[in-house]
């Protein structure tokens, strides 16, 4: 399939019962029926499984990790090899996280500023700088079907003031991630709602990301566990 033949990226609600719903994501590399479980291929490989074995489980999308692929083998090399999907032999859609969760989990090895995050590689201690723009660029180089906005993964527990400051930083980073994103037919970018366990902060976050509240019923939602 050439890029001119790819269907546009989109989402439709197929059925709804109260707050529960069943939907379908359409991408240039296949559909994903939601709710969906994403096998994790951290470093462009789902451990102990070949791509056809992953597909045989019914999985329609794989998640790969920007942080780990940035460190090894590096986004430039992955791009030269045709992207993560080609590298691992996976024909379906691919979602990459922004690298934010892993960077935030480094604790004393990282330093957060308005610009982004500076951190030491857990492999050899080399210094790296990850910004919303760089995270978005790397995910483009990895050829992610779904790119995630760069965010600060708020620690738990957090006070209200800590959660608000973290959420507001993530929303500023989200705007920069959006500006850096290169739109392509069949690809999409997701924002990430922050605000910890505080409902009003989460609604503020939604407003920042979508300019409407609550989340529209015809938009996809991705949930990942909070850091502890």
Residue map of PLM features:
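Distinct, well-ordered alpha-helical segments
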Residues: 199-208
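Conserved small/polar residues in nucleotide/adenosyl-binding loops
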Residues: 211-220
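Conserved hydrophobic/aromatic pocket- or pore-lining residues that grip, position, or stack substrates
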Residues: 139, 191, 209
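Hydrophobic alpha-helical segments, chiefly the membrane-spanning helices
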Residues: 210, 223-228
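Short, small-residue-enriched loops and turns at beta-alpha junctions
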Residues: 155-156, 195-200
């Amino acid at each position: 399939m050439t890029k001119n033949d790819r269907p546009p990226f989109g989402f439709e609600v197929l059925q709804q019962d109260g707050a529960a719903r069943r939907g379908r994501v359409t991408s240039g590399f296949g559909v994903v029926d939601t709710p969906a479980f994403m096998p994790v291929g951290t470093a462009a490989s789902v451990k102990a499984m070949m791509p056809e074995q992953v597909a045989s489980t019914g999985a329609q999308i794989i998640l790969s990790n920007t942080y780990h692929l940035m460190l090894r083998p590096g986004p430039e090399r992955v791009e030269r090899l045709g992207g993560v999907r080609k590298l691992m032999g996976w024909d379906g859609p691919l979602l990459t996280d922004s690298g934010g969760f892993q960077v935030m989990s480094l604790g004393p090895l990282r330093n957060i500023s308005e610009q982004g995050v500076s951190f030491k590689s857990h492999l050899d201690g080399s210094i790296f700088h990850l910004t919303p723009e760089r995270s978005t660029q790397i995910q483009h180089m990895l050829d992610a079907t779904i790119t995630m906005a760069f965010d600060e993964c708020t620690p738990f527990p957090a006070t209200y003031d800590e959660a608000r400051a973290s959420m507001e930083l993530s929303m500023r980073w989200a705007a920069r991630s959006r500006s850096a994103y290169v739109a392509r037919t069949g690809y999409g970018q997701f924002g990430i709602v922050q605000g910890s366990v505080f409902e009003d902060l989460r609604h503020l976050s939604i407003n920042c990301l979508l300019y409407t509240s609550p989340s529209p019923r015809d938009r996809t939602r991705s949930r990942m566990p909070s850091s502890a």
